[in-house]
């Protein structure tokens, strides 16, 4: 019996020891996890600081060489736009590939730039949502007539009219403005070439021995046309509006409230409208300041419905479609000229004034620091010798 009791006591002690060792191991592991997490967070903070310092350094260097960079950008922009116009006439079937290349290269670069400027919520706007759908259509479903009509409605509806209404400016010395114009202008040109000018599309869509069509897709059924050019695009737009509201006004609400420098489309529009005290600002305040955002959503919905309805006659008429392309390009060029002749001179004057105000304290300190020392007078020399 005594041996059994000793054995049970030993087993209890061993069980307690094993429990303590397991407990200690768990504590050690939790400590290691906490230490690793702290180390990774410190490394992330250090990496972020290094990247921000590098970004500031690059921005300062860009400011120092601003004129040269603007000249290079203007040269490349003019040559690129001229090459695009040549390609549009010589090989219209290659325009969709040019658009895909542009989107894949410049939209990620814009996200990096906008992230640094705290403008990255602009990339949740409808134009980027629609351009992503365009990319899916062109790369994955190029022969899907229904998806083509939805994309056509977006490209020649809200995106095209935003180019005119929001006064996008074709300024070749500004990469940001060029990209903004092309995001709204290129999709319409892409779907124009596919519908009216693309010989490869026509050859693929016409069986041998049948009469050639004048356009693709050929739609004779008016209800079908109304459904895929207006109703379905409106449903897709509503889906975007719901997602945008959930992300910006629900999920990221506290983040935006903490940092007023982070810009969204609503913040930019409200600031500009309030500063100008225009009709948009007055109409948005009909239901009170607390409901301005809902009024902006309503205005955008009305704008979208109206512009999508206009895509139906544009889709059916080649001449009307050509006139609309000329109107869009003319508006972008006109706004660019207005920017160069009216806005840019004011910006240059403001920059010069800012430089002068920054240089004034330095110039005031220079005479005091480098003032020439006069030789001591006879009285001063005697006083120094006496002491």
From Swiss-Prot:
Belongs to the GPC1 family. It is a multi-pass membrane protein. Keywords: Acyltransferase, Lipid biosynthesis, Lipid metabolism, Membrane, Phospholipid biosynthesis, Phospholipid metabolism, Transferase, Transmembrane, Transmembrane helix. It catalyses: sn-glycerol 3-phosphocholine + an acyl-CoA = a 1-acyl-sn-glycero-3-phosphocholine + CoA; sn-glycero-3-phosphoethanolamine + an acyl-CoA = a monoacyl-sn-glycero-3-phosphoethanolamine + CoA. Its EC number is 2.3.1.-. InterPro entries: GPCAT (IPR021261). Residues 89-93, 142-145, 195-227, 317-319 are lumenal. It is found in: Membrane. It holds the Pfam family DUF2838. Glycerophosphocholine acyltransferase (GPCAT) that utilizes acyl-CoA to acylate glycero-3-phosphocholine (GPC), forming lysophosphatidylcholine (LPC). Shows broad acyl specificities with a preference for 16:0-CoA, polyunsaturated acyl-CoA, and the hydroxylated ricinoleoyl-CoA. Also catalyzes the acylation of glycero-3-phosphoethanolamine (GPE) with acyl-CoA. In addition to acyl-CoA, GPCAT efficiently utilizes LPC and lysophosphatidylethanolamine (LPE) as acyl donors in the acylation of GPC. This is Glycerophosphocholine acyltransferase 1. It comes from Brassica napus. One of its GO terms (biological process) is phosphatidylcholine biosynthetic process. GO terms for cellular component: membrane. The chain crosses the membrane at residues 68-88, 94-114, 121-141, 146-166, 174-194, 228-248, 296-316, 320-340. It is an enzyme of class 2 (transferase). Coiled coil: none annotated. Residues 352-387 are annotated as: Disordered. One of its GO terms (molecular function) is glycero-3-phosphocholine acyltransferase activity. The keyword Transferase applies. Residues 1-67, 115-120, 167-173, 249-295, 341-387 are cytoplasmic.
